[in-house]
Amino acid sequence: MRSTVSVIKADIGSLAGHHVVHPDTMAAANRVLAEAKRQGIILDYYITNVGDDLELIMSHTRGELDTKVHETAWDAFKEATKVSKELGLYAAGQDLLSDSFSGNLKGMGPGIAELDIEERPSEPIAIFMADKTEPGAFNLPLYKMFADPFNTAGLVIDPTMNEGFKFEVLDVYEGQSVVLNSPEEMYSLLGLIGTPARYVIRRVYRKADNMIGSVTSIERLNLIAGKYVGKDDPVLIVRLQHGFPALGEALEAFSFPYLVPGWMRGSHYGPIMPVSQRDAKATRFDGPPRLIGLGFNVKNGKLTGPSDLFDDPAFDETRRMASVITDYMRRHGPFMPHRLEPTEMEYTTLPTLIEKLKPRFKKEEDVKKAKPSVYTSKDQGMD
């Protein structure tokens, strides 16, 4: 059977600042999705949150970018936003960048990851959802899951994985993508995805039969809106087992609390902290950036689960290390490398401050202006 899993998220307002979704807004979204299930638009659904993001997980048979499915999600977010405004929640409707729905949600603010598959006899999946960071935050764990044999033993042991995987990498600034093969193009792949603010792993395919293995949301709100309107808070769907990473291999990729951009005001680097659903809320310095994982099985278009994947003492040390790194990074205050690099600050109010100070700068005769790099040009696209 062919079925689709759609994970669509948005920040529609939260309690006490950028902290946590209010249960009444989730109840409002639930009413919309329950009606869509009754009408047969979707077959099953699950609603959750990570931090201030409302997450809609829906299964159906309508394929990707289906108008009715996306309109259902839009209606759920709008109804939840109404409740947010009634309760006076913070940043009500923040991620909804348009006033009206127009066919599908692409470019309208919500983050979208959709996996359209021919179901295997057993179809286990993991859905990872992050708060206070951006889509490129999944570059490192996706590389480890699908290309690093030190993380994923199946790359060595499983014959169906031994040929490797294909990585579709998107340049979010130019709107262009390139497909790179692992292991033979591993170094070129790392050359791109090591700049996660620009190059994002969008999809991964098994090289042996071109079967899709993962999909990541790629919406970057500031690039859509032209200003800072909150971090993108990405979602990731990964297929598991039998020719794909085992569940334990997928989770192993998050055992190291690596640094990601986002955190406070979307302007700081901090460690990603994998947590249980009950701890999925932003606290210290609006973070540290949180990650939850839910495990499901898909059968005949319906969802069995979830399992709260990080609700386990095996990740206690990861969380402890993330807390130590949090403390270390915070001691830098407004200085880099805690604060993001200038190119990533362009969509904050920092350029306004610099413009205000411009008249006070004066030319120093004994200092030459830097020459442009010979390795870059005004047009950095790959035409």
Swiss-Prot record:
Keywords for this protein: Carbohydrate metabolism, Gluconeogenesis, Hydrolase, Lyase, Magnesium, Metal-binding, Schiff base
Reaction equation(s) it catalyzes: beta-D-fructose 1,6-bisphosphate + H2O = beta-D-fructose 6-phosphate + phosphate; beta-D-fructose 1,6-bisphosphate = D-glyceraldehyde 3-phosphate + dihydroxyacetone phosphate
Native organism: Metallosphaera sedula (strain ATCC 51363 / DSM 5348 / JCM 9185 / NBRC 15509 / TH2)
Record pathway: Carbohydrate biosynthesis; gluconeogenesis
Positions annotated to bind Mg(2+) 4: 232
Binding-site list for Mg(2+) 1: 11, 18, 52, 94
Protein name: Fructose-1,6-bisphosphate aldolase/phosphatase
Domain of life where this protein originates: Archaea
Keyword Hydrolase in record: yes
GO molecular function, one term: fructose 1,6-bisphosphate 1-phosphatase activity
Family according to the record: Belongs to the FBP aldolase/phosphatase family.
Cofactor(s), names only, from the UniProt record: Mg(2+)
Keyword match Lyase: yes
Region (Disordered): 361-383
Binding site residues for dihydroxyacetone phosphate: 18, 132, 265, 286
Assembly behavior: Homooctamer; dimer of tetramers.
Entry remark concerning the domains of this protein: Consists of a single catalytic domain, but remodels its active-site architecture via a large structural change to exhibit dual activities.
Record-listed Mg(2+) 3 binding positions: 231-233
Residue sites binding beta-D-fructose 1,6-bisphosphate per the record: 18, 90, 103-104, 132, 241-242, 265, 286, 347
Record-annotated active site: 11 (proton acceptor), 228 (proton donor/acceptor), 231 (schiff-base intermediate with dhap)
Alphabetized InterPro entries for the sequence: FBPase_V (IPR002803), FBPase_V_sf (IPR036076)
Enzyme Commission (EC) number: 3.1.3.11, 4.1.2.13
Compositionally biased intervals (Polar residues): 374-383
Residues engaged in binding Mg(2+) 2: 52-53, 131, 233
Function: Catalyzes two subsequent steps in gluconeogenesis: the aldol condensation of dihydroxyacetone phosphate (DHAP) and glyceraldehyde-3-phosphate (GA3P) to fructose-1,6-bisphosphate (FBP), and the dephosphorylation of FBP to fructose-6-phosphate (F6P).
